[in-house]
Each structure stands twice: as C-alpha cells, then as structure tokens.
Amino acid sequence: MGGNAAERARGIKLMIFDVDGVLTDGRLYLSDSGEEMKAFNTRDGQGIKLLRENGIAVGVITARSSRVVERRARELGIELLRQGAADKASVFAELLSGQNLNASEAGYMGDDLADLPVLIRCGFAASVPSAPEAVRTRAHYVARAAGGEGAAREVCEFILKSQNALEHAIGGYLA
C-alpha cells in the first residue's frame, strides 16, 4: 500500500467518493412515510473541504438516489454529483471528460463490487476495511477507519500529504 499509493495520490486532481459504506456507515434508515436518513461524519466533510480548498475537485458517484445526499453534497460544495448511477464506469468517464482529465489524474473511493469498474480504471483507488476482499485487494489504499467514521477524511489527508500540501491545508487553522 505505502509508496505506490503515495506516488499515485500525488497526481490526483479529482477525487470521487461513493456514498453508502464510504461517506456513511452503509446503513439505510427508512421511515414508514418513505423518508430516507443517513448519517455523515463531519470530519469526512472537513476532509472534502480541505481537498477543494487545495485545488482538488471532488465528486460523488452513487447507485442510489437520495435528497439527503443531494443536500450533503450542496453543503460541502460538491458540484460533481451523480446519483442513480447503474453504470459507474460510464459516469466516471463522463466526469473525466467534463473536467478534461485522464483516469490517472482521478481517484475513487468505494466499498463494494459495484465500485470495481471505477476502482480498476482510476489512478488512485481507495477503500474501507469492511469492503469485500475483491475490492480491498484492488485498492491502492485501504483506510484504517471505517466508512462513515473518518475513512474519507483519512484518504483526503493521505492525498494532501502525498502532494506535500497537508501542512499548508491545516495552516489556516493554526492562526
């Protein structure tokens, strides 16, 4: 994981996240009235903001569609939100084209088999410790923290550290 992952993360200009199991713990809360609730970790959100503040675009690709995800993306300033993505690889290609990037300049963090088509195409693949072995073994970086419990933040900081930008990123909070 170490050196190769850092080398791959160094060139990332776009980081894309799955939602369920990555930005959340993967559990869905459904009410009788049909409302869907998800819990997001504020530290993950801060990590996403740090990426954006340091010139790294952030996107979300998720197979499900949810107003909750739309709201959270808006709160974090994520404009590259694609929900209801049955074919994540084609959505990934569309995002790359829209940002005028090639696959080696994009990272992706996923947690399940549906994420494999993107994980094997991107320049920097990240996952969570609870992901199936088929996903973990194809990831360049597997977070120590669980999905929805700081895994995304850990990956954001890893990218910034790989780009020698982490100290600069947190510097504004030390003033």
Which sequence ranges carry the predicted segments?
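Basic, amphipathic juxtamembrane/active-site segments
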Residues: 6, 27-49, 129
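Fold-independent oxyanion-binding glycine-rich loops
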Residues: 19-20, 25-26, 64, 111-112, ...
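Non-catalytic pre-domain segments flanking phosphatase-related domains
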Residues: 1-17, 165-175
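Substrate-recognition element of Asp-dependent hydrolases with the DxDx(T/V) motif
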Residues: 48-72, 83, 119
